[in-house]
Amino acid sequence: MDKKEYSETFYHPYKPYDIQVQLMETVYRVLSEGKKIAILESPTGTGKTLSLICATMTWLRMNKADIFTRMETNIKTNEDDSENLSDDEPDWVIDTYRKSVLQEKVDLLNDYEKHLNEINTTSCKQLKTMCDLDKEHGRYKSVDPLRKKRKGARHLDVSLEEQDFIPRPYESDSENNDTSKSTRGGRISDKDYKLSELNSQIITLLDKIDGKVSRDPNNGDRFDVTNQNPVKIYYASRTYSQLGQFTSQLRLPSFPSSFRDKVPNEKVKYLPLASKKQLCINPKVMKWKTLEAINDACADLRHSKEGCMFYQNTNEWRHCPDTLALRDMIFSEIQDIEDLVPLGKSLGICPYYASREALPIAEVVTLPYQYLLSESTRSSLQINLENSIVIIDEAHNLIETINSIYSSQISLEDLKNCHKGIVTYFNKFKSRLNPGNRVNLLKLNSLLMTLIQFIVKNFKKIGQEIDPNDMFTGSNIDTLNIHKLLRYIKVSKIAYKIDTYNQALKEEESSKNENPIKETHKKSVSSQPLLFKVSQFLYCLTNLTSEGQFFFEKNYSIKYMLLEPSKPFESILNQAKCVVLAGGTMEPMSEFLSNLLPEVPSKDITTLSCNHVIPKENLQTYITNQPELEFTFEKRMSPSLVNNHLFQFFVDLSKAVPKKGGIVAFFPSYQYLAHVIQCWKQNDRFATLNNVRKIFYEAKDGDDILSGYSDSVAEGRGSLLLAIVGGKLSEGINFQDDLCRAVVMVGLPFPNIFSGELIVKRKHLAAKIMKSGGTEEEASRATKEFMENICMKAVNQSVGRAIRHANDYANIYLLDVRYNRPNFRKKLSRWVQDSINSEHTTHQVISSTRKFFSMRSLNSR
């Protein structure tokens, strides 16, 4: 297939909408023209994920086809390519290139595809038998000692015993403690991935055929070097649920082979990366509750004398039949994260480490934000982004996520509880701890007491900036000591032992008192292990940068916050061929340009804001110009505004929207919604409105109300859901069809300007403007723009919950006269802007609403 056909069809499994074609063409053009950044807004429900898959996979296969075609052409014409090769290349490499080894490469690729097809038609149990047979054909090398070890220890005691809580002996300041250092043999070095020109790509492909890359003589797998894909598509999203949705979408299209008829059935090599919490199959590790504890328990077990029966950090394990079988099963069809665990169990192979070994072969890799955005995590997982395509979905939260990854916070209460936990642990086990463990625990406890005293003595106001050197003034603690303590925490795995011991004590005490810990409390404790929080905070203390700042936050906390998210993001930009930032609500895009991409030339950035797939008549957005409806900080508590104008609007809207359809209203904060509810209840207005529509409202510590609201809507009784911007229901919930026929935004949800975080951010932004030669007026405008961007991003994210598919319909009501101002309207998503109705009074809005729904044939009850 030629390039024209590639770029026009994209192998979309259905007839694509115009905006899907527009998005696919934009992505393909960005990749073909070598642009660095694409910022794409495509509303939820418009098939964004599938469009991204089709465009990027089409380009990837086309790119590989181009390389293959040029290789064929060079070989057929016996073209001398030596001038494009390095002068120090040995003669045999050039001779090999000039001879027709290409056919051998093709044969190996074809053999591997046939091998994957055989696996795809075989059950997991049958595959294990097939692996035993395959070693006779030279594909795998049997490693009998590993098999015997795995078969010999199937029954495990997974209860928590006291021995589980005791660390191995630790020698203070000794380098011999670090059992985590190991070499990973049989891997290609980073330089082998740096393929910037066609000829370097050709050389690498040839190298992988005939041995320029060093091969392990114990490696019986003839496929692992042949099938590496240096150029990959990395797709990152916020949750594993979203990554699972990507997997289901990837199964829909079919893409042609990069090698046409020579390798006719080239499968998509898809690899879902996940954490040990999702993929671990060892009961001794799985019994721990938190990701941090699981990671430490895994490392502790792997480095113990007993070891893990599912994994060994050796080339022998990597090339044993079952490890290779699991790798190939991953690629035999498109597997979800949940599929990897039963596959690993059936073969007795760790799916977490086996999936990491499969990384070089993969074409498409999905991974959670943390894996992509943390440079240290990418390094530890050997994720090389060189010349690859990086797609970051749900990117509206990208800046906040980067800031969160590189920030840390610890409260006075956290420090006191951690101190108490260490004392409890130390008193219990001190006689069973070696001197190295005892000394370091005492040092750690002393450090905690120093931080406690610093907060008690120095906390004056939220947003007060802190010089980190002041925290330890007058103590014998310095940065070197903190480095040593961090190393102790990492090597000894003491954090999870102390945290889990104290949690076990709480559960035991609760059980004895016949007063079980509430499930919600247990979850909160296990999800925030205190000593892990402390170690993260200490890490920030030892890795100071000019882009971060320590300051006091509420609840007597010290927070370290990254102020320049563009700095850690630079490493991704520098390595990747292209970075695609995609989301349903990406406006205002100026936030990305100023905060994340300040050094990227505008010519290298492409932006696209798509309209919705629904017909224009399926959506109306109303803004009233009634001056009474202005929810500024000074006016929003007004009894007249709350009890008269706001209340009457909801009564009128509740009557205008058919009862079969639900109404979802978003309020700027829990505090304000609680104030409104209280006012309405004091004068029976709440009961009056509740008689028109059953009211469900979100409370900060309340129970889940979504199921009750959904049931009420399904029964057609008329339902009103009052939710919070940034709350549990404003993101990730699909209010499609009758769940939301009207979405109301009450006021403009500006963030709290008195929070320590915003005080420091605004001060930093103003200082940066002034330092670059700006005026005070320019600094003031920049901080105002910063606050507006936060506000409007929240608005777009909330109202985007309403329309979820092509046949859906709903109305949006922006209930504040300030939405009429150009600076706010221009920051609405394009599809919302294009649907704005010019009605002015609430009476006109309600009248137009009745007409809208009368045309939709909704049954009114």
Curated annotation (Swiss-Prot):
The annotation note on the cofactor reads: Binds 1 [4Fe-4S] cluster.
Per UniProt, the short sequence motif DEAH box occupies residue numbers 393-396
* Modified residues annotated as Phosphoserine in this record: 86, 172
Q: Which residues form the Helicase ATP-binding domain?
A: 6-458
Which keywords, in A-to-Z order, does the entry hold?
A: ATP-binding, Cell cycle, DNA-binding, Helicase, Hydrolase, Iron, Iron-sulfur, Isomerase, Metal-binding, Nucleotide-binding, Nucleus, Phosphoprotein
Q: Which reaction does it catalyse?
A: Couples ATP hydrolysis with the unwinding of duplex DNA at the replication fork by translocating in the 5'-3' direction. This creates two antiparallel DNA single strands (ssDNA). The leading ssDNA polymer is the template for DNA polymerase III holoenzyme which synthesizes a continuous strand; ATP + H2O = ADP + phosphate + H(+)
What is the main EC category here?
A: isomerase
- E.C. code: 5.6.2.3
Indicate the principal place this protein occupies in or around the cell.
Answer: nucleus
Give the region (Disordered) as residue ranges: 161-188
Q: Name the domain of life this protein comes from.
A: Eukaryota
Task: State the compartments where it is located.
Answer: Nucleus
| Gene Ontology BP annotations | DNA damage response; establishment of sister chromatid cohesion; nucleobase-containing compound metabolic process
> What is the required cofactor set for this protein?
[4Fe-4S] cluster
What family does the entry list?
Belongs to the DEAD box helicase family. DEAH subfamily. DDX11/CHL1 sub-subfamily.
Which GO cellular component terms, listed alphabetically, does the Swiss-Prot or TrEMBL entry include? nucleus
Which SUPFAM superfamilies does the record associate with it? P-loop containing nucleoside triphosphate hydrolases
Q: Which GO terms describe its molecular function?
A: ATP binding; ATP hydrolysis activity; DNA binding; DNA helicase activity; iron-sulfur cluster binding; metal ion binding
Amino-acid positions noted as binding ATP in the UniProt annotation, renumbered to this chain: 42-49
What is this protein for, i.e. what is its function?
A: ATP-dependent DNA helicase important for chromosome transmission and normal cell cycle progression in G(2)/M. May have a role in changing DNA topology to allow the loading of proteins involved in maintaining sister chromatid cohesion in the vicinity of the centromeres. Has a specific role in chromosome segregation during meiosis II.
Q: Where does [4Fe-4S] cluster bind?
A: 280, 298, 308, 350
What is the name of this protein? Answer: ATP-dependent DNA helicase CHL1
